[in-house]
Swiss-Prot record:
HAMAP family: Ribosomal_bS18. It comes from Triticum aestivum (Wheat). Residues 1-61, 149-170 are annotated as: Disordered. Belongs to the bacterial ribosomal protein bS18 family. Residues 13-26 have a biased composition (Polar residues). It comes from the Eukaryota. This is Small ribosomal subunit protein bS18c. The lineage of its organism: Eukaryota, Viridiplantae, Streptophyta, Embryophyta, Tracheophyta. Residues 27-55 have a biased composition (Basic residues). GO terms for biological process: translation.
């Protein structure tokens, strides 16, 4: 049954300003009512276009003998790829890691892929031994000051050591 709103009942006591104290500092600041309101809707990401197919299908068995599956999760150097790169769940990553380790122990997989590792090392060496810019022979004042302070410290250290040696000889 629908009940209508009850009418506002006036209090029997008369309103007196002297009894109530009005303290502005304790009152929270209220903005005036706005005539136009915007209703904000929460931002929802649509998962449809960004949906990626999982790397492990529902029928794939994570086993040390399933080499085609295991090879997807190993880098060119033979290292196990991280979860972030693989996009696997924790449980899947754990099972893959165990399968890779078991395959290595049973010599289905090498511990390292030496062919690709040699290529990788050759590239890194060529980058390091490439043409280097000439060092500037001009030494800034700060470096000279630092070197002179270091020389003074070394000299003082040597003097202290000599004094100790002389006192221990006596």
């Amino acid at each position: 049954m629908y009940t209508s709103k009850q009418p506002f009942l006036k209090s029997k006591q008369p309103f007196s300003k002297s009894k109530q104290t009005f303290n502005k500092s304790k009152q929270p600041f209220r903005k005036s009512k706005q005539t136009f309101r915007k209703f904000k809707q929460p931002f929802r990401k649509s998962k449809q276009p960004f949906r990626r197919r999982p790397r492990i299908g529902p029928g794939d068995r994570i086993d040390y003998r399933n080499m085609s599956l295991i090879n997807r999760f190993i880098s060119e150097q033979g290292k196990i790829l991280s979860r972030r790169i693989n996009r696997l769940t924790l449980k899947q990553q754990r099972l893959i890691t165990l399968a890779i380790k078991q395959a290595r122990i049973l010599s289905f997989l090498p511990f390292r892929n030496y062919e690709n590792e040699k290529q990788f090392q050759a590239q890194s060496i060529s980058i390091i031994t490439g043409s280097r810019p000439r060092k500037n022979r001009h030494i800034p004042q700060l470096t000279q000051k630092y070197n002179s302070n270091r020389n003074l410290r070394n000299n003082n250290q040597n003097l202290r050591n000599n004094n100790r040696n002389l006192s221990s000889d006596c």
